[in-house]
Amino acid sequence: MYSHPSAKVDIVLVHGLNGDPQRTWTAKSPNGNGAFWPVDLLPKSLEAENAHANVLVYGYNADVSSKKHGTGPSSNYIHQHAQTLVTFLTTYRKSRKTTRNPIIWVAHSLGGILVKRALEHSDSVRVADHEDYRSIYVSTYGIIFLGTPHDGSELASWGSALQGMAGHVPRKFFDSEPVLIETLRKDNETLDNININFLNIYQRFKIHMVHENQKTDLKGTKSLIVDAKSAAPRLPGVTSYGVEADVSNY
């Protein structure tokens, strides 16, 4: 998305549930000309500090309610998305000869769960033919989690949020939930396993966990979609704090 010839770090942004690589990272403005901050704002801020970075925005099908990307709701499990992310980033870094650059992740909502699973997958690669995949784990320096439901969120909250932000939820949403929504349920086995495995590796990374302080307007009622307990669980060495924003406006 943005590359610098003297880049010493790769910053990777990963959107969340029902998001996309453009809209999620575009700041709203009254005149309608939003700033796409990975390109319009972040590079300038880095240059001001004499820091040079490549900024990558990763996109994947995180749809759960509509065919806005020309496809239906994602049927891939979080592990499949994680494998694809590791493969994509490995290929990109090899093509740019930046495989030794440290990686900083910025992950919103479900994107945080995806990043955790991707790092676990990368760490598990021990086959010589794919040793380059493990470089993603080895190169990761830091992670910024934005409103990531590490401990899950009630299904009703996610359904209401999507209804409020997207305007509708499929009639059968609560009867047959998309696999990505299922992953975010409290006490979901897949989510629990991701968290257990991440506890074994997280201390090698610099981690910031950010949670929302403002409730999301869900058509007349306001609610925290991801509470502080889930978005910022207490872990030794992890920095956690709230921001004055709701789940869709970090």
Language-model-detected regions and their locations in the chain:
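Short, conserved loop/helix-junction motifs that constitute active-site signature segments
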Residues: P5-S6, E47-E49, R134-V138, L199-Q203
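Short coil/turn segments at secondary-structure boundaries
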Residues: R23-S29, K68-G72, R117-H121, L155-A161, ...
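Conserved alpha/beta-hydrolase
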Residues: L46-S65
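Aromatic/acidic cage segments in peptide-binding pockets
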Residues: T26-A35, P73-Y77, W158-D175, A232-P236
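Short, surface-exposed "cap/lid" segments of acyl-processing enzymes
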Residues: M1-H52, S122
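Eukaryotic intrinsically disordered and solvent-exposed regulatory patches
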Residues: M1, L41-L42, L89-R93, N101, ...
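C-terminal catalytic-base region of ester-bond hydrolases, centering on the histidine
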Residues: I11, G19, N54, D63, ...
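Serine-dependent carboxylesterase/thioesterase catalytic core
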Residues: H15, S65, H79-N195
